């Protein structure tokens, strides 16, 4: 228990405490320079960083963008993941371990590498399949870029969520299925009336993790932004936070970046809690 507690404190609690502390400070000139500038020093600014973050229109625009992205991507990914899990849990598929591994492999690919691979597939000059699509197809146009990113993350995380559903399905007593078959239920009826209702908890977990992951969307837009300057450095909240930290966006530094990150965590938590409460109310109805 002690090693776990030490790791929990070092890996989880300490970064949160450091981030909270940093959010109340900003780097300002000391005033000791020849023209009043001088060395940058950490100065306590109270809630100023949070006020700046909360009133920054670019932050809320990027947040609205990822919320729209989540509304497009999460339902599709969860539906596909559940469908694959139901298929692997049935007696239709032989060698389910092989299929399980093949579906999970995209998740094992590092995020940046996967994003670069999709950038290659989306680039007209080098893509092997774009020449076969209708002329004018552009996966990186302003009107299609969210769908393109949704496709990238769905490819990556469907296998991961499939394993969550499959673990829940395999925990269901097989006696329930046998009893249903004796009563004349078809495979489809067993799936819809027994399996799907019993994996509601797994679905809740998968959606909550997806919501949190969506707020942190970073790899895909960063890689695509390198080839599409119109996206800007604040296309997603995570990009805005990172570029604020790196001095690409003003006000910059660890203080404003920490305020953005804590605001993102608060929004992700609120969205997750609201979804969980809605699902609980639906389950009690």
Residue ranges and their predicted role:
Residues 1-285:
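A structural signal for multi-pass alpha-helical bundles of membrane permease subunits
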